[in-house]
Amino acid sequence: MKTFHQRDDAKEILDDLKIQGEAVSQNLKELDTINSLLGGNTISVAALKTVVKSHPKKTHWKIADLGCGSGHLMLEMNKVLQQQRCTGVFTGFDANPFIVQYAQAHCADDSSIRILCQNVLTDPFPEIYDVVHAALFLHHFTADELVLLLVKLKKQTAIALVINDLHRHALAYYAIKWLTGLFSKSYLVKNDAALSVAKGFKKSEWKTILERAGYKYYAIKWVWAFRHQLIIYPNSSS
């Protein structure tokens, strides 16, 4: 019987940065569908809206999306800015060249979005951003790697970090394993979706990681379906 007391340290298939082809395209399409149906996108959108509303005089935003995948969430976040009568420029980062090409095509109609092929853990960022966002991305790292990345992001984030990631729980694990086994056409999704849950974090683990990285001001909220929404302020409480 699988236990969930500790994070699974197994690598996901998609952690191979050289993987490419139709299987990856199918994986990205299905992930977008899963996030839309299970409300995953709304977690990031709601967090960004909270940050934007807390700065009513600011009308232009620079936003980075780490591990951006298809880029779909940047399109959704841009709608939030427009609803708040703001403008924005988005930079998506992914270390897989094939995924970068996919995202560039997916976001081609939005001139405010650019996609860069970059390893965010090891490569320098080109600029400072108002908001740095990461959805379903940070569970790919070990706790030590994540601390290093968060320390690095302190210097790159002017206002807030927004994190949307998985809560490690048996119900979430077996539910997504059953759903993807039944409906998914992607061997990547069938393997990686449940493993992602097993690699997710408990709330207490997030607190430990943030404290190790030197963050004092943050809000962590559990959100359906088995996600944590984090809004982190690197330099102040707002």
PLM regions and their residue ranges:
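A short, conserved alpha-helix within the catalytic core of class I
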Residues: 141-152
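C-terminal alpha-helical "lid/dimerization" subdomain adjacent to the S-adenosyl-L-methionine
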Residues: 166-213, 219
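Conserved beta-strand signature within the Rossmann-like core of class I S-adenosyl-L-methionine
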Residues: 158-166
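Class I SAM-dependent methyltransferase SAM/SAH-binding core
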Residues: 64, 70-72, 77-122
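N-terminal, positively charged/glycine-rich alpha-helical extensions of SAM-dependent methyltransferases
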Residues: 1-30
